């Protein structure tokens, strides 16, 4: 177990409790970039262990340094909305897919040179079309910037009308019929409005902080994804959820990579929702591979590192790994292995760390494997600014975490 962890400058992350001097561990995006390290942070632990508090604190710290944030909010209470409303001096946008007041239609929120490609990816997933099939080829043609300009296609709704009434390309009306299924609020509920309602103003992706509420979005389970029969019978709202998570991941890449002179972070609590969509997982893979060159973070929260990070590329590129309270021996063992400790080559250290993971000392306490693979005991810092601390609390007050 190490006494010195993390960086010596940057954003204060935690007190290294294993150190006699109670030193601080810092996260430093620019130092990681210069050292050719990845920019991914993963918090592992049971509900109430302190993951979300830490994610929100990093959000505020990055925003205070002039960075940009895009985050998902899967909570019933809209806890991320509450938190970002406590951050002063930033432009924020809230897109709540359960009660949409802003549109996420890629043809409305992105410039024409990007919009068609992102919309094509979204619609291929939503409509379950093959990229090089007849319908997929038609979709690619009508979403080219010049074609959209010539035919005044400025929204997904307008695209559907064009395909249904004005387009002579093969299978155009069949594509329009498929879109109509998902654009029907009786089939897709509020998700239909979030993309296809022309009366909603478009979300502003240039905002300093963009929160996308994902509460209530249903996704296919593992059995449905693996069974062709069950997959074909998926209800529209589950198909829509799968496509929407992939769209969010692609939007995050565009937002966070848009200005390489400015730090940015994509924050995903409850990461299993994102990784359960194969298309979203692929987009996350691309994000992680390229994030170092763009000065962009990926910050995630998870209960189970083995199940929630099935993409080996993403898992191997996570440089900062924090394991907090685990509620059973199986998850504690997975957590310690996730830290890089091998139970076969280091059985005594492994057993000792599993005991810590099962009883780390309270919310925010746990183990940290830093960018060099050093592992030590820590206590995560809570926000020092009282309004942030109060707004960040998604549980009863945690009196045993320090602030900074």
Predicted regions and their residues:
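Basic- and hydrophobic-enriched, low-structure N-terminal and domain-boundary segments
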Residues: 1-39, 383-385, 395-404
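Conserved SF1/SF2 helicase motif Ia
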Residues: 65-67
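Conserved P-loop NTPase
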Residues: 344-399
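P-loop NTPase motor domains
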Residues: 1-24, 74, 85, 102-289, ...
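Conserved beta-strand scaffold positions in the cores of enzyme catalytic domains, especially
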Residues: 69-71, 89-94, 209-211, 321-323
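Conserved P-loop NTPase motor cores
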Residues: 30-61, 70-79, 98, 227-349, ...
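Short conserved micro-motifs at the rims of enzyme active sites and ligand-binding pockets
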Residues: 104-107, 221-225, 333-335, 379-381, ...
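P-loop NTPase switch/communication element
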Residues: 76-106
């Amino acid at each position: 177990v190490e006494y010195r962890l993390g960086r010596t400058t940057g954003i204060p992350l935690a007190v290294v409790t294993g150190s006699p001097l109670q030193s601080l561990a810092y996260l430093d995006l620019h130092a990681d970039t210069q050292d050719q390290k990845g920019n991914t942070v993963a918090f592992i632990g049971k509900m109430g262990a302190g993951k979300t508090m830490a994610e929100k604190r990093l959000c505020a710290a990055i925003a205070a340094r002039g960075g940009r944030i895009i985050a998902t909010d899967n909570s019933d209470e809209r806890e991320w909305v509450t938190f970002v409303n406590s951050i002063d001096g930033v432009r924020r946008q809230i897109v709540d897919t359960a009660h949409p007041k802003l549109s996420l239609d890629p043809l409305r929120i992105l410039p024409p040179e990007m919009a068609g490609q992102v919309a094509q990816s979204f619609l291929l997933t939503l409509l379950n079309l093959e990229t090089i099939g007849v319908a997929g080829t038609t979709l690619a043609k009508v979403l080219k910037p010049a074609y959209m300009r010539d035919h005044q296609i400025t929204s997904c709704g307008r695209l559907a009308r064009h395909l249904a009434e004005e387009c002579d390309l093969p299978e155009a009306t069949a594509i329009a019929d498929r879109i109509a299924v998902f654009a029907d609020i009786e089939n897709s509920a509020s998700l239909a409005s979030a993309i296809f309602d022309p009366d909603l103003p478009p979300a502003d992706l240039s905002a300093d902080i963009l929160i996308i509420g994902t509460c209530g979005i249903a996704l296919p389970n593992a059995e449905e994804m693996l069974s062709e029969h069950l997959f074909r019978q998926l209800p529209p709202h589950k198909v829509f959820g799968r496509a929407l998570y992939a769209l969010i991941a692609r939007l995050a890449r565009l937002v966070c990579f848009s200005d390489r002179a400015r730090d940015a972070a994509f924050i995903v609590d409850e990461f299993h929702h994102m990784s359960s969509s194969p298309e979203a997982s692929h987009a996350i893979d691309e994000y992680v591979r390229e994030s170092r060159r763009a000065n962009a973070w990926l910050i995630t929260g998870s209960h189970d590192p083995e199940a929630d990070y099935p993409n080996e590329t993403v898992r191997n590129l996570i440089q900062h790994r924090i394991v907090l309270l685990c509620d059973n021996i199986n998850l504690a063992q997975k957590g310690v292995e996730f830290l890089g400790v091998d139970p076969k080559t280091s059985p005594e250290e492994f057993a000792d760390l599993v005991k810590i993971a099962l009883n780390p000392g309270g919310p925010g306490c746990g183990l940290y494997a830093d960018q060099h693979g050093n592992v030590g005991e820590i206590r995560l810092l809570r926000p020092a600014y009282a309004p942030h601390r109060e707004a960040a609390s998604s549980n009863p007050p945690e009196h045993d975490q320090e602030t900074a």
